Design a protein with these regions (language model features):
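Histidine/acidic residue-rich metal-binding segments in metalloenzymes
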Residues: 109-117, 139-184
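Acidic, glycine-rich loop-and-beta core segments that form the ion-binding/anion-interacting portion
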Residues: 181-182, 187-193
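Active-site glycine- and acidic-residue-rich loops that bind
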Residues: 102-106, 161-168, 190-194
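Histidine-centered active-site/metal-ligand motif
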Residues: 2, 167, 187
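N-terminal hydrophobic targeting/anchoring segments and the immediately downstream early-domain regions
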Residues: 1-125, 130-142, 146-147, 193
Length: 194
């Protein structure tokens, strides 16, 4: 469900194309061959990017989502509503824009709203590290959801967006499960099978 194609397109500044770039683990040709019906495209910001640059890096990746992934592949269709999946034609593939870690927005819910307006419909609060929303799986402190994280989940609930529990520490996972109406685990493992 999850792929890092947008990060690679951003890193190469558009020198590779989503349609058939062999450098991408996920490209249009591979999606067709695998008969994939919906693909999630993650916007990811490396932790070492300066705080004041993170939102712009997110916007740049979204630019490649619209100009290359959707713009150069007419059979890719933007998924903004649940019904968009149901109305996909046989030869179409849905493209779901996601955010992996909310570091790009700092503590500004208005920036989060802008990302929603640009098409983001699934949000992972962290990427292994701690941020202003929650602690990630590699944060030794293991604290849960912050009040800002609760605000993000409330926004997700109101707008029928997925809250992705991938990369969260255990306490943050359970905090999200207690308040999220639309939780998912897009790329996670279970601790046990019962």
């Amino acid at each position: 469900m999850h792929c890092d194609a947008l990060l690679k397109l951003y890193e190469t500044q558009g020198k590779i194309q989503f349609k058939e770039a062999i450098e991408l683990e996920t490209n249009m040709e591979r999606l067709k061959k695998g008969k994939v019906k919906v693909q999630a495209f993650a916007v990811f910001i490396y932790p070492e990017i300066k705080a004041e640059q993170k939102f712009q890096v997110a916007l740049d990746q979204i630019h490649y989502f619209y100009t290359d992934v959707l713009g150069n592949n007419p059979n890719m269709k933007l998924i903004k509503e649940w019904t968009d999946i149901e109305t996909l034609q046989e030869d179409e593939i849905g493209a779901l824009l996601t955010l992996e870690g909310v570091d790009a927005i700092g503590n500004d819910i208005k920036k989060f709203s802008i990302l929603y307006q640009l098409g983001v419909r699934s949000v992972g609060l962290t990427w292994n590290n701690a941020n202003l929303a929650a602690d990630g799986a590699q944060e030794k402190r293991g604290a849960g959801l912050t009040s800002f994280g609760e605000e993000i989940v409330a926004f997700n609930n109101e707008h029928k967006m997925f809250t992705d529990v991938s990369h969260l520490c255990e306490k943050a996972f359970w905090d999200v499960m207690n308040v999220a109406k639309y939780p998912i685990a897009s790329h996670s493992n279970s601790r046990a099978i019962m």
